[in-house]
Amino acid sequence: MGFLHKLWDETVAGPTPDNGLGKLRKHDSLSTVRSSPPSLSSDQVTRSIMVTKGNNNVRGLRKLKMDPDSPTCSSSNPGTPLTPGTPCYALGPFTAGKIPSSGEDDAASLTTYEWIVINALDR
């Protein structure tokens, strides 16, 4: 029993038991609360999630860029300390356009973030 006394941590488990582990506090709070038996109704909720795999436009993600001419973006809008480069949002913060690249967009030219997002969507 000496080994168990050394491992006992009062900050986690509370005060040590008087004799043996059978004297530990037992919480009866859960046994006093009784719930009614589940009723058989037509309004049942399913607990499943179905993820459909569609035509994910991977290259379309790379074509999004911030609109630099947004009227709300100015140096007078302070950024938060945690995200100093947070973009300012107008009604349409993203505009579709091509990002200049040296070659064809393919899977090897994806950023790490895009690769993680695409792989998470494919699961």
From Swiss-Prot:
Residues 30-46 have a biased composition (Low complexity). The keyword Repeat does not apply. The modification Phosphoserine is found at S74. InterPro entries: DRM/ARP. Residues 47-58, 71-80 have a biased composition (Polar residues). Residues 7-86 are annotated as: Disordered. Pfam families: Auxin_repressed. Signal peptide: none annotated. Keywords: Phosphoprotein. Belongs to the DRM1/ARP family. This is Dormancy-associated protein homolog 4.
